[in-house]
Amino acid sequence: MTDPLSIAPRDQAEILARALPYIRRFHGKTMVIKYGGNAMTDPALQADFAEDVVLLKLVGMNPVVVHGGGPQIETALNRLGKKGVFIQGMRVTDAETMEVVEWVLAGQVQQDIVGLINQAGGKAVGLTGRDGAMIRAQKLKMVDSKDSSIEHDIGQVGDIVSIDPSVVKALQDDAFIPVISPIGFGENNESYNINADVVASKLATVLQAQKLVLLTNTPGVLDKKGNLLTDLTAREIDALFADGTISGGMLPKIAGALDAAKAGVHAVHIIDGRVPHAMLLEILTDQAFGTMIRSH
């Protein structure tokens, strides 16, 4: 993080003045942030992220954090002698893996994020989809992306049936910052592991968020030559799916982002979480950053 004392006072004032139009525009608006990738594992980036979230809250916005935890889950599974298996970007989740996922996400990762935000001066509260009966889910039916006659059984991976945002809204009204682990529950009280990008996208839609911001380990969406695609429409995304440019873990991320854009979320951005204070650059400046997803 840049030491504010190293910046000349006039430059500090200029930075704050330039942010004012964005603070005014987004005051009272909800920002759903998917927190994942290197930003979750690098201590300096962790601190930057927490400070960014607290700043957004202090200037009158309503940040809601949905977090991943893939690397942490993988580490825990390796300690148990299990190897993670992925199909079309989704983790195959048997009963034992589901126990690990719940423990790592809700018991470790979520609490670390809550602690960092609170340490930075915010008031964060950790939730899973079980809290307040927020995220109801059912077993995901995964059809093969190349052969629709094939259906993959990936265990306790959930497809969202509904989201009740009342607990999130209640926390926002009391000046708390919700931090949500992507775990849902089924009709028989079984747990489901749900892709965090999908949860963030659906939650942004239900909350009628002003922005959905997805932090990644890349500058945004890249073409096959590695060039950044700064603006994508639904038609362009379909073409990138078809030719294999978008694959693996980016599949659910982009699909969820597009669904949110189609459902009326005002702005959907995929940005590089490896950049210090990436969120502030996206929300409080006019700097072109990452990839913007549009429905048309």
Curated annotation (Swiss-Prot):
Catalytic activity, as annotated: N-acetyl-L-glutamate + ATP = N-acetyl-L-glutamyl 5-phosphate + ADP
GO cellular component, one term: cytoplasm
Domain of life: Bacteria
Entry keyword set: Amino-acid biosynthesis, Arginine biosynthesis, ATP-binding, Cytoplasm, Kinase, Nucleotide-binding, Transferase
Annotated site (Transition state stabilizer): 34, 253
Subcellular locations according to the entry: Cytoplasm
Pfam families named among the record's database cross-references: AA_kinase (PF00696)
Binding site for substrate: 69-70, 91, 193
Major place of residence: cytoplasm
Biological processes annotated in GO: arginine biosynthetic process via ornithine; L-arginine biosynthetic process
Keyword Kinase: yes
Keyword Coiled coil recorded: no
UniProt pathway annotation: Amino-acid biosynthesis; L-arginine biosynthesis; N(2)-acetyl-L-ornithine from L-glutamate: step 2/4
GO terms, molecular function: acetylglutamate kinase activity; ATP binding
EC numbers on record: 2.7.2.8
Function (record text): Catalyzes the ATP-dependent phosphorylation of N-acetyl-L-glutamate.
PANTHER family: N-ACETYLGLUTAMATE SYNTHASE, N-ACETYLGLUTAMATE SYNTHASE, MITOCHONDRIAL
Family: Belongs to the acetylglutamate kinase family. ArgB subfamily.
Name the record gives this protein: Acetylglutamate kinase
